[in-house]
Swiss-Prot record:
Organism: Methanocaldococcus jannaschii (strain ATCC 43067 / DSM 2661 / JAL-1 / JCM 10045 / NBRC 100440) (Methanococcus jannaschii)
GO biological process: L-histidine biosynthetic process
Cofactor(s) recorded in Swiss-Prot or TrEMBL: Mg(2+); Zn(2+)
Principal location listed in the UniProt entry: cytoplasm
Annotated Mg(2+) binding sites: 83, 85, 87
Name of this chain's protein: Phosphoribosyl-AMP cyclohydrolase
SUPFAM superfamilies according to UniProt: HisI-like (SSF141734)
Organismal lineage: Archaea, Methanobacteriati, Methanobacteriota, Methanomada group, Methanococci
Gene that this sequence comes from: hisI
Length: 127
C-alpha cells in the first residue's frame, strides 16, 4: 500500500487547531469500546499507516508521539474508517495494557453524577 496515495484518496479535511493542521482520531478496541480521542496531523497518520502502530499529535507538547513509546501500552492498528465529512477518523486497534495515562483501560473513566465528577469503574474498569 502506498501511504501517500492512500492519504490523498481519503480526501481528509484537516482543521487548523492551535496553528496546526489536525484531524480528530477516535480510537476503539476490537469490541468497539472507546479507548481515547486524540488529534493527528498528516505525519501521524502516515506513520500509523507505515508502521501499523498508532501515532498521534500532542497539542500540549507540539510533537508527534507513538502511543506506548514510554509505557509500552501500544495500539496495533487493525482497521480504520473515515467519517462522512472527512473530518474525523475511527481506528480499531489491538490495545496492549491500558490506553489512559492515568492507568485506566479507557480515558473515559470519569462519570458526572449529581453535578459531581467521579472516577468510576461502571463504564471501564482499571486493568
Amino acid at each position: 500500500m502506498d501511504v501517500e496515495d492512500t492519504v490523498k484518496k481519503l480526501n481528509l479535511k484537516f482543521r487548523n487547531i492551535e496553528g496546526e493542521r489536525l484531524i480528530l482520531a477516535i480510537t476503539c478496541d476490537e469490541n468497539k469500546n472507546v479507548l481515547m480521542v486524540a488529534f493527528m496531523n498528516e505525519e501521524a497518520l502516515k506513520k500509523t499507516l507505515e508502521t501499523g502502530y498508532m501515532h498521534y499529535y500532542s497539542t500540549s507538547r507540539k510533537k508527534l508521539w507513538r502511543k506506548g513509546e514510554e509505557s509500552g501500552n501500544v495500539q496495533k492498528l487493525i482497521k480504520f474508517y473515515r467519517d462522512c465529512d472527512g473530518d474525523a477518523l475511527l481506528f480499531i486497534v489491538e490495545q496492549k495494557g491500558v490506553a489512559c495515562h492515568e492507568g485506566y483501560y479507557s480515558c473515559f473513566h470519569y462519570k458526572i453524577e449529581d453535578g459531581e465528577l467521579k472516577i468510576t469503574g461502571e463504564y471501564y474498569s482499571k486493568r
